[in-house]
Every structure is written in structure tokens, then in C-alpha cells.
Amino acid sequence: MTSAPILVTGGAGFIGANFVRYVVDEHPDVFVTVLDKLTYAGNEANLSGLPEDRVKLVVGDIADAAIVDTLAKEADAIIHYAAESHNDNSLKDPSPFVITNIMGTYTLIEAARKYDIRFHHVSTDEVYGDLPLREDLPGHGEGEGEKFMPMTRYNPSSPYSSTKAGSDLLVRAWVRSFGLKATISNTSNNYGPYQHIEKFIPRQVTNILSDIKPKLYGSGKNVRDWIHTYDHATGVWTILEKGCIGETYLLGADGELDNLTVLKMILRDMGRSEDDFDFVQDRAGHDLRYAIDATKTREELGWKPKYTDFETGLKDTIKWYEDNREWWQQEKVEVEAKYAQNNQ
């Protein structure tokens, strides 16, 4: 990309804020406007310390056409991170997911179409549903169709993933019908600094730091394909610079691990016994395995992740939560109380 102002939706959330920080650190000629509703998952503190001459925060809703129009008119590209994204919450009340993930995306792509600007849509591998465990597959997870690929059939299994699938399809349709200059990325599970403590890794880490016994859904055999949020940021920027309009790119770091292994790794790295946790009731419709095949992104665009050793990135993440207790402690009691209502 050439030097230009960009609009980042959801830029005060976990993944969006890490992208904004990456841009500020590594692309000094780019000005970033962040549009964020500042729901519970967004936090102005996620952008603290960033220079005011590089980053502007606008508090607003991506489904508000007037605000979106004003900001899109001043931007050369929109990078769309904003989303309702917690599966458990989508099972309790799907309506915010429909409004934000579908109607919000519609509002943004209409503005991008109006001003003929570049649009990148950040999505999830959960739109593809889930996969069998490696031991149950003929190629043990490495055969054809045993990982998600850009053309894998959509098969979402929750209100969250179905609304993300719907937003992906809107973007694809606007590319074909109206010539929208858009790309899509689907990524695996992110980890790193600034992630809300309701999510798996920060919940376990902050439980230990709060002298609360960690909790593990079901059997712990569910597999996630972990990618550090820094690598997600570099992947999105690479797609912005080199991606072909209308194409979908997958971002993953070959980080497949089951939840039990990750939890035991956290406990070990934090000086606890690997068995110092409780199994709790599983989530309804809990997807079994996610796995990304990022070959297309790596070979066509030359992207590669920095954090290829998961435990190195995990240790960095644990240290961040240890060093930034003031960022998460105030919300801890409330978050755990919500989980307790579901015996989780």
C-alpha cells in the first residue's frame, strides 16, 4: 500500500488494537482512524501510549451509516475487524451478532463501494465448522481436505460463526456484483496481549494469577490452531499490499494443540501442577477441531509467521498479563460470575 489514511473498525478490541500497534510501529507514514463501539470487548486502554498524530479513536457503531460514511470518505482503505465474537454469548442472545456482524458489514461495504476504496474483511475459520481429530483421519490431519482451505465449504455451527459466514458472503457478493475492491482473511484462534479475559488462554492465566482454579470445558480434547496476534497483523497487512481483489486468504501458524495440552502448558509455565484444574460442563455445540492450511497465503504472498513455536509466544503472553494486572483485575470477578452461572 502507498502512504494513506486507513480506517480500522474494532481497533480498540484485542486483534484490532494489536493491528493498530503493528501499523504504528512498522509503517510510520500511515495514519489510523479507529472506529469502535467500545462494548465490553473494546477498551480505550488497548490504544494507550499511541501518538495522537498517528491514531484517532472515534467511538461509534459500524451499523451507523452516517458515522461510517463520514469516516470512509476520509480513508483510502477500510480494515474491518469489528465483530461480536464470543460463542457463549451468541448462544444466549444472537441479536447483537446479527446486527453487528451482518448489518455492520453491510454498512461498511456500501460505504467502501460508494467511495471506491480498498476493503479488507477479517473473518474466522469457524465459518467452516469443525474437523475430525487427526487420529480419526486417513492422512492424520495432513491429507486433502483434512485442514481448512480457502474453498472449504461453509458449515457454521453457532450463531456467532453463522453471522460471520453471512458477512463473508456479503463481501464476496459485493465484489462480484459491484466491483468492490475487497479481500477476505479467515484466521485460526488468536492469542497475545490485550485479549479479553473471557477467552480461553487469558482466562486460565488470570485465574491462576487470581488464585482461582482453572476450568476446562468437557474432556479438553477440542483442538485449536493457535496464531499469535502479531502474526495475524502482519498477515493482514501483507494481504492489503499484495492480495488479489476477490480472493480469500487463510492465516495460520501450524499451531494445532488440544485445549488440555495448552492448559497444562500454562500451568507448567506458571509454576503450578499440571493437574491443578477442574473439568466443567462443555459448551453446547463445541467444535471439535480447527486447522488452517495457509499454503496459498505463504506461497502467493510470501507471508510467514514469526511465532512458529507456540510456547515462546505463550510465555510472552503470560508475562504480559502478569505485568499488566491493572488492565484486567477490575473485570475478573464479573467475568467469572457469568461463567459460574453456567457451571463453567
Question: Can you say where each PLM-predicted feature lies in the sequence?
Answer:
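Residues at alpha-helix boundaries and the short loops/turns that link adjacent helices
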Residues: 41, 65, 84, 194, ...
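NAD(P)-dependent short-chain dehydrogenase/reductase
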Residues: 132-147, 159, 169-241, 254-256, ...
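N-terminal Rossmann-like NAD(P)+-binding domain of SDR-like oxidoreductases, especially those catalyzing
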Residues: 1-190, 320-324, 334, 338-344
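C-terminal substrate-binding subdomain of Rossmann-fold SDR/epimerase-dehydratase oxidoreductases
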Residues: 7, 32, 60-63, 208-344
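Residues in well-ordered alpha-helical elements
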Residues: 66-69, 88, 95, 106, ...
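Non-catalytic, surface-exposed connector residues within folded enzymatic/regulatory domains
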Residues: 91, 122, 181-184, 198, ...
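Short, solvent-exposed loop/helix junctions and linker helices
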Residues: 9, 91, 99-102, 160-164, ...
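Structural element of the ATP-grasp superfamily
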Residues: 108, 171, 204, 297-298
